């Protein structure tokens, strides 16, 4: 098992307001599977993804990544584990505008202290896999929306993580481009054996994943 959430509850306190966003969520993610979490805006989808990625701490419950309980680790240990085993894709690509596609994809490898030559070769190969071999020296402003998301996917996969967490990865794309980007993620999951957890409000796209869950008022249930 790659990722496991047990009894995740998240509450926010703002003055007199006590808001429970997630109620005792349980979820298991296995190697190589594609899993969609569908819900309306404000249902807690992004909060759940942040908790599972170790980007925030639950009020109660726990998350296990590759068999290790995140709450039992120091912040530095959590960061190292996350960098080794997780990739992230967001609705907004978060590419650095002053860097080329190649440099954006290579950056996680630089953080791992790979040599510039090794990083460039690995990033070039990954960009070719996502269909951008002729665009590696273009900056984000010189790429289309779909191309920018492909760069973001390449960046998430370049370290060969066990799981990619994707938060509305096609939310800013038109239907045709969204279909292409979504199919690319499914194909890469098959090719690399990487698990993908995709948060989306789009039920049509979600039906193409191996497992589907609905999140309503902070409660998660699996669809048949």
Curated annotation (Swiss-Prot):
<keyword id="KW-0813">Transport</keyword>
<feature type="binding site">
    <location>
        <begin position="39"/>
        <end position="46"/>
    </location>
    <ligand>
        <name>ATP</name>
    </ligand>
</feature>
<keyword id="KW-1278">Translocase</keyword>
<dbReference type="GO" id="GO:0089705">
    <property type="term" value="P:protein localization to outer membrane"/>
</dbReference>
<comment type="similarity">
    <text>Belongs to the ABC transporter superfamily. Lipoprotein translocase (TC 3.A.1.125) family.</text>
</comment>
<dbReference type="GO" id="GO:0005886">
    <property type="term" value="C:plasma membrane"/>
</dbReference>
<dbReference type="InterPro" id="IPR003439">
    <property type="entry name" value="ABC_transporter-like_ATP-bd"/>
</dbReference>
<dbReference type="GO" id="GO:0044874">
    <property type="term" value="P:lipoprotein localization to outer membrane"/>
</dbReference>
<dbReference type="InterPro" id="IPR003593">
    <property type="entry name" value="AAA+_ATPase"/>
</dbReference>
<dbReference type="InterPro" id="IPR027417">
    <property type="entry name" value="P-loop_NTPase"/>
</dbReference>
<dbReference type="Pfam" id="PF00005">
    <property type="entry name" value="ABC_tran"/>
</dbReference>
<dbReference type="GO" id="GO:0016887">
    <property type="term" value="F:ATP hydrolysis activity"/>
</dbReference>
<comment type="function">
    <text>Part of the ABC transporter complex LolCDE involved in the translocation of mature outer membrane-directed lipoproteins, from the inner membrane to the periplasmic chaperone, LolA. Responsible for the formation of the LolA-lipoprotein complex in an ATP-dependent manner.</text>
</comment>
<dbReference type="InterPro" id="IPR017871">
    <property type="entry name" value="ABC_transporter-like_CS"/>
</dbReference>
<dbReference type="InterPro" id="IPR017911">
    <property type="entry name" value="MacB-like_ATP-bd"/>
</dbReference>
<feature type="domain" description="ABC transporter">
    <location>
        <begin position="3"/>
        <end position="224"/>
    </location>
</feature>
<protein>
    <recommendedName>
        <fullName>Lipoprotein-releasing system ATP-binding protein LolD</fullName>
        <ecNumber>7.6.2.-</ecNumber>
    </recommendedName>
</protein>
<dbReference type="InterPro" id="IPR015854">
    <property type="entry name" value="ABC_transpr_LolD-like"/>
</dbReference>
<dbReference type="GO" id="GO:0022857">
    <property type="term" value="F:transmembrane transporter activity"/>
</dbReference>
<comment type="subunit">
    <text>The complex is composed of two ATP-binding proteins (LolD) and two transmembrane proteins (LolC and LolE).</text>
</comment>
<dbReference type="InterPro" id="IPR011924">
    <property type="entry name" value="LolD_lipo_ATP-bd"/>
</dbReference>
<keyword id="KW-1003">Cell membrane</keyword>
<keyword id="KW-0472">Membrane</keyword>
<dbReference type="GO" id="GO:0005524">
    <property type="term" value="F:ATP binding"/>
</dbReference>
<keyword id="KW-0547">Nucleotide-binding</keyword>
<keyword id="KW-0997">Cell inner membrane</keyword>
<keyword id="KW-0067">ATP-binding</keyword>
